[in-house]
């Protein structure tokens, strides 16, 4: 079975060049699981030792 020329592994540069970034919406990224600060880690270590 022959695949049409449009189904290639190489990106279509014309398609990329006509992509309009202004159509993208700006979203605020929110960390779902923020890492604990060094202070929090130290407090937890000390709490675990006592």
UniProtKB/Swiss-Prot annotation:
Sites bearing N6-acetyllysine, chain numbering: 10, 18, 32, 38, 45
Record-linked Pfam families: Thymosin
UniProt biased composition (Basic and acidic residues): 9-31, 39-50
Modified residues (Phosphoserine): 8, 37
Subcellular location(s) per record: Cytoplasm, Cytoskeleton
Tissues and organs where the protein is expressed, per its UniProt entry: Originally found in thymus but it is widely distributed in many tissues.
Record's keyword annotation contains Kinase: no
Subunit structure: Identified in a complex composed of ACTA1, COBL, GSN AND TMSB4X. Interacts with SERPINB1.
Protein name per UniProt: Thymosin beta-4
Native species: Mus musculus
Gene name per UniProt: Tmsb4x
């Amino acid at each position: 079975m022959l695949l049409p020329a449009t189904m290639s592994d190489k990106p279509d540069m014309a398609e990329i060049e006509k992509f309009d970034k202004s159509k993208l919406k700006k979203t605020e990224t929110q960390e779902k699981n923020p890492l604990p600060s060094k202070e929090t880690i130290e407090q937890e270590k000390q709490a675990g030792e006592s």
